[in-house]
Amino acid sequence: MWAHVVRHFEQFLGELELKDPERLDAEGKAERIAKSLFSKYYPNLAFNPSSYVKVGSYGKGTATRPRTDLDMLFIVPWDVYTRIDALTGNKQSQLLQEVRRTLLVTFPNTEISADGQAVVAPFQTYNVDIVPAFRFTTGELAGQYMIADTTDGGRWRFSNPVAEYNWLRQVDVASAGKATHLIKMLKAWKRECNVDIKSISLEILVSVFVTQWEYRHQTIFYYDWMIRDFFAFIMNYVNGWTRPAGITEQILLGNCWESKCRTAYDRALKACDYEQADDGFAASCEWQKIFGSQFHLDWIHSLLMARVGA
């Protein structure tokens, strides 16, 4: 029984893994952007790689193929905040526009835009979201960042990507990497089934789930059950809230994703039954309905069964 589970999920996770050229491409773009902004905001200093931080899925190691947007914070000096905060009107928008104009000098042929919390540079292979940020180094907020939000007339918000990263790493250490693996697989579900739920919310829910899942210390042999059990778990959070690590702001989950989650759970139930019965092809068909073509159909098992039947 369950003869195909390990092979199925090892292959699936391999398909989701970014390739080295993709990682190098992302890192190269982030560094070019950082160098452009560094020369603007630190004109008398040699470039310092610690002036920017990759955040989001790339920063936390949960990025998957196909490539997604790269999010980065660029650390802006506090004297810039003093200057911007003294302006009238939407101060946050003016900061983003200043960053945009700076990047246009380096990337004149790129249609760079600024809105919300980020300046967006849509390169051919990656969209890079650049968030100018002011870093707190002392006091209660040490380690956190203040970022601009241009919506509703503009305001300053707080972000703590280090706390998010550390929390995920702690869960991974306690579960042999299951949190990161599950997040990557669920991103494939989100993309394939067009699920209306924020990736950050999925990451938070995965961390909560994995810390209490009874099989968290087991191997990849249990990943079919992990998928099934997570979809059952998340149904308890319909219209609930999640809160990113390190900040007090909460994110409303809503219920737009409920129907697709129930469908995924039903398909996972079938897939688990097929896995137990060693029907690798039927199981892979159900998994593919959830995750898309990156979960390959198990033609090997199908051909072997046909050969046995012959």
Segments predicted by a language model, with ranges:
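Short hydrophobic/aromatic beta-strand micro-patches
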Residues: 73-75
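Acidic/Ser/Thr-rich, low-complexity mid-to-C-terminal regulatory regions of eukaryotic proteins
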Residues: 131-178
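Short, well-structured alpha-helical interface segments that form or flank functional binding sites
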Residues: 94, 114-116, 125, 139, ...
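N-terminal regions immediately upstream of nucleotidyltransferase
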Residues: 1-53, 57-67, 78-90
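Conserved nucleotidyltransferase catalytic core and NTase-mimicking acidic/glycine-rich helix/loop elements
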Residues: 178-290, 294-296, 309
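Conserved catalytic core of two-metal-ion nucleotidyltransferases
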Residues: 4, 8, 24, 37, ...
